[in-house]
Amino acid sequence: MLGTFSINDKLGKRLVAILKGFPCSWGRCNFCPFAIEQSFNTRDVIFTNRRIINEALKTLEKEDHKRIAVFNGSSFHELPYDTIEKLRELAKRHIFEIESRSEYINISSIEALLSYYEPEKLIIRIGFEVYDEKIRENLLNKGMPNTELQRIYRLKNEVKELGLPIEFWVYVLFGIEYIPEEKVIESIKVFKKMFDGIIAIKYKKYLPSHPKEVPISEYLAKFLEENTDLVDWGGEQWIIERRD
């Protein structure tokens, strides 16, 4: 999955850069496959990401993209400084999307990102996955209780009052055994009132220890398409591969 690609979907034309990351500091979500592509080797992470960022910059020279999305399978703030610095040229004057766990996000950290990258807009994606706290904490083991959910909601409102060009988007997970369809629907209805955008993610099982995939109804598929900003059904570009 590492690399760059252009995509044109409900969010418009985007340039996506999927970077190599260090293992997530939390690392206990029981469905997450991203450790497969991560590394403890700092040199490996730095030089892999230099190559990917250079590819992205070359693409920008040939094609116009207003929206740049950067993913690294953990939190943006866990990337090495070399990578953080080299992303400035990609981010400046673009709509810049990153992913993060909630604990890294506060008014100081996001103001620092705005100052450093000077994006047209900063979009922060957070994987709360489901509104139901018992499912999120006891079954998915996310480590993001409702206190964090409410804190990020208050932060979103504070950012709006300050007039900062920042949006908070959340992921909702579906097609996984622990989250019944009615809880997926509940999550979307609640999160639509709380945050700026929702992306629904179809779960894919990668490891034997991971929860099972479950089929979804036509009703849920239609509901997702009509009530979220994007449904990520998966695709070849998102396949995670072990790279030793």
Regions from the language model: what does each represent?
Residues 34-79, 91-106, 120-149, 169, ...:
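Core AdoMet radical
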Residues 59-62, 87-91, 111-121, 157-163, ...:
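Acidic (Asp/Glu)-rich catalytic clusters
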Residues 147-210, 223-237:
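Conserved C-terminal portion of the radical SAM core fold
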Residues 43-48, 140-148, 179-186, 212-219:
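Alpha-helix N-cap and loop-to-helix initiation/capping positions
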Residues 2-51:
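Canonical Radical SAM [4Fe-4S] cluster-binding loop centered on the CxxxCxxC motif
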Residues 26-29, 132-135, 207-209:
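Short acidic/His/Gly/Ser-rich catalytic and metal-binding motifs that mark active-site loops
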Residues 79-88, 106-116, 181-184:
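Distinct, well-ordered alpha-helical segments
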Residues 243-244:
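Class I (Rossmann-like) S-adenosyl-L-methionine-dependent methyltransferase catalytic domain
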